[in-house]
Curated annotation (Swiss-Prot):
It is an enzyme of class 2 (transferase). This is DNA polymerase III subunit delta'. It comes from the Bacteria. It comes from Escherichia coli (strain K12). The gene is holB. GO terms for cellular component: DNA polymerase III complex; DNA polymerase III, clamp loader complex; replisome.
Amino acid sequence: MRWYPWLRPDFEKLVASYQAGRGHHALLIQALPGMGDDALIYALSRYLLCQQPQGHKSCGHCRGCQLMQAGTHPDYYTLAPEKGKNTLGVDAVREVTEKLNEHARLGGAKVVWVTDAALLTDAAANALLKTLEEPPAETWFFLATREPERLLATLRSRCRLHYLAPPPEQYAVTWLSREVTMSQDALLAALRLSAGSPGAALALFQGDNWQARETLCQALAYSVPSGDWYSLLAALNHEQAPARLHWLATLLMDALKRHHGAAQVTNVDVPGLVAELANHLSPSRLQAILGDVCHIREQLMSVTGINRELLITDLLLRIEHYLQPGVVLPVPHL
């Protein structure tokens, strides 16, 4: 896993809390995708399991460090869903918690990393909760999450929340400019599309992601003046439809911002398209379309086995209906 420079302040702050005896036994780390929370947790784990730490760092030479580097440390436990599953079950949690009651194999600390706490089943969360309420000595837990509110309230209450905030925007753009050759506007747009996460922004430039966004923008540039929104189906009906609907939603939001005179927009690399949307669609129509786009996106992400093509087709035909004169628009449900 890759270490990112913006992780250092958080790493040093957390290590200092352990050094001062104020480190919480269960740390709930909230971070956006691409922020590097996995690398932060791994670095903290290496520090806690190091037998001869040097300042804020693990030594890299002791038996504990060697085993961590080899991926075979007997006192380091990773809790993640089994391959092919999207939940973390109670059996895996119980297997680890039983081992935690034993003496540490290397005689030092024990560390447990829950890679995505939101995937814990209720039974698994309750099993983990029992251990968090009475943790074994020298045992540290790291729970990663995108949305803490999805966790059981009792589980959250036993943890200390640490939010891994995105770095300042200009810092992130500078970092991105060293990683990929793109215009400053494209870098800034990717960063804002990723809610400020530099790692997620970089991922947009990998594979065919950015080309897919450009294709969507080109299709939208045709559909807006022509009124043929159904022509967007090919650009949206894809296994990555939630991401593409997110791109569409940000363009609609930027057009709304333009109506209201807001200075900061997300899609700074396509100002002409944003202006076209604002010129052709009133604020009320933009709000109605935006509400439906967000609703469909949520359905695609939360309902298993849903017919994606049918759902998106219905969305696009409904948008065309909204453009007809005299149509009563729905109340926005954002």
